[in-house]
Amino acid sequence: MGKSVVVLGAQWGDEGKGKIVDLLTDRAKYVVRYQGGHNAGHTLIINGEKTVLRLIPSGILRANVTCLIGNGVVLSPSALMQEMGELESRGINVRERLLISEACPLILPYHVAMDHAREAALGKKAIGTTGRGIGPAYEDKVARRGLRVGDLFDKEQFAEKLKNILDYYNFQLVNYYKVEAVDYQKTLDDVMAVADIITGMVADIGAILNTARKNGDNILFEGAQGAMLDIDHGTYPYVTSSNTTAGGVATGSGLGPRNIDYVLGIIKAYCTRVGGGPFTTELFDEVGQEIARKGNEFGAVTGRPRRCGWFDAVAIRRAIQVNSITGFCMTKLDVLDGFDEVKICVGYKLPNGEVVDYAPLAAKDWEGVEPVYETMPGWKENTFRVTDVDQLPVNCLNYIKRIEEVTGVPVAILSTGPDRVETMILQDPFTA
């Protein structure tokens, strides 16, 4: 019988999901994106060759896998064409193996313009978006005014709808934000130039997935960003605009929630965050700088430096609760090699002195919160590219075990390097 496995970030994104999805896709027939857009940056290194995928599921690098983009994804035609071009130039047949829901909202130039205008207006209080129009596109979806992939089938009606919505956006851009209007004709021409390519890949994603379940096929759901960036359960308002948690799988793909068999939460051996928002264990000293240097902590999409800190078990507990995480995959374990001591945040000290073991929901409630640490001895031995768990240093194993104890979730996979072979699978999600 086939399994449906969800791979999602359990922290603030950038946990290394792309590599793990790629690793597990040799067991799957379908790989599905169900939320987010091209603000995701999934980096894969295979035989030394680096690939960064932003929109197309990571399974595209496996010849026997069909990739699906579900209705929960906001789709940029220009980003899709660029990514397809890059892959096809390397001999990867994207058009025969990628299927797209007609219900995907489209990201168009006016969304990007609005994203930039709003961030600029917020100044120092900016959310720290990627500036790719993700939020405005989701707004249009909820407001029921957005254009969707299915609208591309009727070009005449699309042109009319585009005119109306562009008038709406340009009025705000010009009169409120005092920036240039978005050109209607260029926007229309650019979309129409690729419309037939996109509509040629349209399919009923929900029907495909439900048929796959009946046929006993393995399905892998590829999450983007991280659980603590979820629009509802993250550190609002410093969040993304979609449901990054496991609940987004059902609503963003059309497969019912009872058909999810395993939720694999990806965690770094430490924590990182990009952009604004609370980060209790953030380090501002030389240790934080060393983690950033060794971990090469720069965003795959934006190139922005990531904030670094110790592992936060308190925040992870909320991610476990919201996602029903079955097992962890711990990545970048090797980054902690060489430290005299390592720390795990096991509680939050509130401004009134009370120590709690749960994370606040709203960003404002994190103000003045201090981490309560357990300090453990570090390890000097090298764990980079180790592929046998018995070869890991004792202190490293103790660190992993302690994280399992304080979270109540087993570590199913360990990653000690960027390549897909630099991995230890302790519990296979498709056979567990």
Swiss-Prot record:
- Residues engaged in binding substrate: A300, V301, T302, G303, R304, P305, R306
Binding residues for GTP, per the UniProt record?
Answer: 13-19, 41-43, 306, 332-334, 415-417
What are the BP-aspect GO terms?
'de novo' AMP biosynthetic process; IMP metabolic process
The UniProt annotation places IMP binding at D14, E15, G16, K17, N39, A40, G41, H42, T130, R144, Q225, T240, R304
Q: Which UniProt keywords apply?
A: Cytoplasm, GTP-binding, Ligase, Magnesium, Metal-binding, Nucleotide-binding, Purine biosynthesis
Q: Does the keyword GTP-binding apply?
A: yes
Q: What superkingdom does the record give?
A: Bacteria
Question: What pathway is it annotated to?
Answer: Purine metabolism; AMP biosynthesis via de novo pathway; AMP from IMP: step 1/2
The free-text note explaining how the cofactor binds reads:
Binds 1 Mg(2+) ion per subunit.
Q: Which cofactor does it need?
A: Mg(2+)
Q: Where in the cell is it found?
A: Cytoplasm
Q: Name one GO molecular function term.
A: adenylosuccinate synthase activity
Q: What family does the entry list?
A: Belongs to the adenylosuccinate synthetase family.
Q: What does this protein do?
A: Plays an important role in the de novo pathway of purine nucleotide biosynthesis. Catalyzes the first committed step in the biosynthesis of AMP from IMP.
Under the heading HAMAP family, the entry gives: Adenylosucc_synth
- Quaternary structure annotation from Swiss-Prot or TrEMBL: Homodimer.
- What is the name of this protein? Adenylosuccinate synthetase
The species is Mannheimia succiniciproducens (strain KCTC 0769BP / MBEL55E)
